[in-house]
Amino acid sequence: MASSLSLGSKILILLIRGYQLGISPLLGPRCRFNPTCSHYGIEALRRFGMIKGSWLTVKRILKCHPLHEGGDDPVPPRKNDDNREN
């Protein structure tokens, strides 16, 4: 997880939370993935920051269509620099 979130990440998370609280309840449960795309987006932004987190979120949203089966699709783990081989 990013040690401190950038202003951009905080704004994007705030927008996603607004969607979760204001729009999503009106649409009902539709997401074919676990976690939902909005939860995925927040986790990706917190874990990877604004640029990579946004990219992962956009890729996830583009998979959300009737031809994709959905299912479990967690945010990928960060590569741990301590485990790299020299």
Curated annotation (Swiss-Prot):
Pfam families: YidD. It is found in: Cell inner membrane. One of its GO terms (cellular component) is plasma membrane. Residues 66-86 are annotated as: Disordered. Keywords: Cell inner membrane, Cell membrane, Membrane. Belongs to the UPF0161 family. This is Putative membrane protein insertion efficiency factor. It comes from Proteus mirabilis (strain HI4320).
